[in-house]
Amino acid sequence: MFLAASREYERNAILGPIERNMTVAIAQAFRKQGKAFLGRFQDLADKLPGILTESEWIELLELAQLETRDLFVNTATEGATLAMVAGIRRTADDLGLPETVLGGAKTWTALLTVAGLRKLLRGGAGAGGPPGLFGALAGAAEMPPVAVVLGIQFGLQNPRAVDYISRVGAALVTKIDETTRDYIRTVITTGVREGQSYNEIAKAITSRYSEFAVGRPQLHIDSRAHLIAVTEVGQAYSEGNHIVGETLRDAGLKMEKRWLVMGDERTCPVCMGNEGVDWIPFDQMFPSGHMRPLAHPACRCDLLMQAVT
């Protein structure tokens, strides 16, 4: 129990600010998308109340989604990058193996701020490199490592990290867009079926987008924007953990892993079952079929690893 509480505190200390910043940015993106859609949806006002086919409004929504796509992609990419670096640092520190880190920081706790992580990433592009986080990503191949364990470099130049970061933004936007279409379809279909006016349907659409930004879908989740942030940051953090294990395994070390739950009333039976098997071989799936956390959206579980001598 102490281990879980300690890990949760440390995890929240570094991921909490990333999640909050990402939540705010995603909420703003939802608001802008809602405004962009309603601006186009107004062209259909003369048809309401009345029959409105999906093809008439879906194209307008897709245009609004395209207009705001970069807001979601850039936010997801930055949040995932910061969380992945934190995950790599956390695991390198966990394993208790020799490491060197940019800027002379010797433990992951030296980076317990979003600003610290951004400074780490931006500093890697070199004096002549492009500025900002995405400049650092563009120069990832030339970046010093985030950590070096037993002579093995870990950081954004790692092929597994590059692959994950390069696709996370687009993959997330695809899921967000699909879910948004389902929500808006329900709002419009219900409105048309009930003979609502344009103003009534537009108000319902506005309300739905507002809920995306500030609603409360779960007890410990404030909104859809928060749910997305918590899930994507957690996934990237866990992927950073896993990348260290994969690379050490490929280098010839025998690795084991363990699923760690937070152990409170919010812990689900699936995650409890994963923790119940204790330490397992690194390449073995947990009972849920996952190789690592997260088992579900908003999952708060952590991954422990150890080298077997």
Kindly give the residue locations of the regions a language model identified:
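N-terminal leader/targeting and assembly helices and adjacent pre-domain segments
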Residues: 1-215, 307-309
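Acidic, glycine-rich two-metal-ion catalytic cores of nucleic acid-processing enzymes
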Residues: 218-309
